């Protein structure tokens, strides 16, 4: 199995640069601060099943908080970013582990037992709230929630990658190459779409919810479906082509 490596070199410089870009964007759009919310867990209708959590990419730009729903980051020009790190005292679900110093040292970390611990942050100033959690829509005025001009500026800034981001992309490409090679071997062995997908995930130690995109694993005529989402568990008798 491919070993996943944690990229730490250059992270402090990355956060400093992200802070600089946010400060410029906030000043240009007339905001005093920004509150970036990770997002919340969503439950399916009339069920107790929670959809896999996907963190707000604007927060992921700052810190590796892939599984940290209901955390939030307060960004003010000239100040250390304040991270409300949601870590509930829970026995029903496994809460996030304590923050690791290699990244947490760049923030003022506020440990939070309640999901709305951030609520009073930035209330007496012009604050932009960034995220799609239901709690934001309920508690924040529409003019402050996801201001499009500010988001457009940040989108543009994110197109220019820091050295840290480039290193992370290189690591992702390395893992992707391992997984693609494992999938190709599965195809040549005559495995089904489902089995090829499992081979892909096992080769790099990931589960579906951790993949950056829903895997398209298509054999034969399924290649023609642009975003083919099924994974047949029975391999065709005659396997002619493979799309990953």
How should these model regions be labeled?
Residues 1-178:
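A composition/biophysics-driven feature that prefers long, compositionally simple stretches
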Residues 8, 12, 159, 186-190, ...:
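Hydrophobic alpha-helical scaffolding
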Residues 47-54, 191-244:
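Short catalytic-site patches enriched in acidic/histidine residues
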Residues 60, 152-158, 185, 214-215, ...:
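Flexible, active-site-adjacent loop/turn segments at secondary-structure boundaries
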Residues 161-213:
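Active-site pocket-lining segments that scaffold enzyme catalytic pockets across diverse folds
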């Amino acid at each position: 199995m491919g070993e996943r490596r944690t990229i730490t070199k250059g992270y402090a410089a990355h956060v400093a640069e992200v802070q600089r870009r946010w400060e410029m964007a906030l000043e240009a759009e007339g905001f005093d601060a920004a509150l970036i919310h990770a997002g919340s867990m969503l439950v399916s209708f009339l069920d107790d099943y929670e959809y896999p959590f996907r963190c707000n990419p604007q927060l992921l730009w700052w810190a590796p908080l892939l599984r940290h729903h209901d955390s939030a980051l307060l960004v003010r020009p000239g100040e250390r970013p304040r991270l409300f790190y949601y870590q509930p005292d829970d026995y029903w679900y496994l809460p996030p582990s304590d923050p690791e110093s290699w990244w947490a040292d760049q923030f003022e970390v506020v440990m939070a037992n309640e999901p709305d611990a951030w609520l009073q942050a930035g209330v007496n100033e012009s604050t932009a709230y960034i995220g799609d959690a239901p709690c934001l829509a309920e508690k924040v005025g529409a003019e402050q929630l996801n201001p499009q001009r500010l988001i457009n500026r940040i989108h543009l800034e994110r197109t220019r990658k820091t050295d840290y981001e480039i290193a992370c992309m290189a690591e992702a490409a390395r893992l992707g190459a391992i997984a693609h090679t494992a999938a190709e071997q599965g195809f040549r062995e005559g495995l089904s779409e489902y089995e090829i997908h499992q081979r892909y995930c096992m080769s790099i130690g990931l589960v579906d919810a951790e993949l950056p995109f829903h895997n398209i694993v298509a054999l034969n005529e399924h290649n023609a479906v642009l975003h083919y989402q099924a994974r047949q568990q029975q391999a065709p008798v005659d396997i002619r082509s493979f799309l990953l």
